């Protein structure tokens, strides 16, 4: 099986959601839906690969307005790629001033996003489903906001829970590089103040998030129904990803 990580120089966590098993026995489609950390430092070579090899048509940016103002959208802003901004957290909620990030309750953060940004998460699912070609969604590290959207998207196309959790944990393979990059930017002072190990993806966090979806909604499909996603949206998502 090909590596799910794409070997870009200017980001470390750009990876394909293809090749994941689903309940139907099929695999999710390669080369159609991607997740990533920030794209602001893509090199000229990276941009060429994104355009010619990935064939990217849509970017879904989950960062806050403040992050985008401070850090920019990166070189893909100047390309003919659709751009969708869906901030899953408010500007004041970016964890850049927490003195000890290890004390954060990450699961509580995820629940808060589900509670306060549910409509935006649903809009992101629809944006993935309606993209005319390859689409990437990203935040800063490609871990939390991106991880929630990936988990919901994968669950909606029938990827089993253990595989969803395993995909979430894949960020740990590149967390050192991701944190080293973010630590250079003043927007992310928490990353600068803590070792990369503090930001590792813990499987019990994603397990807890999926448990919550089960308890409240009977799973991701029930959440989608309750938030107002139509059957045609979910059918379109399955057609795109598998």
Where are these regions (language model features)?
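Ser/Thr-glycine-rich phosphate-binding loops at phosphate-binding pockets of nucleotides
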Residues: 141, 145-146
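Cys-dependent protein tyrosine phosphatase-like superfamily
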Residues: 1-136, 148-242
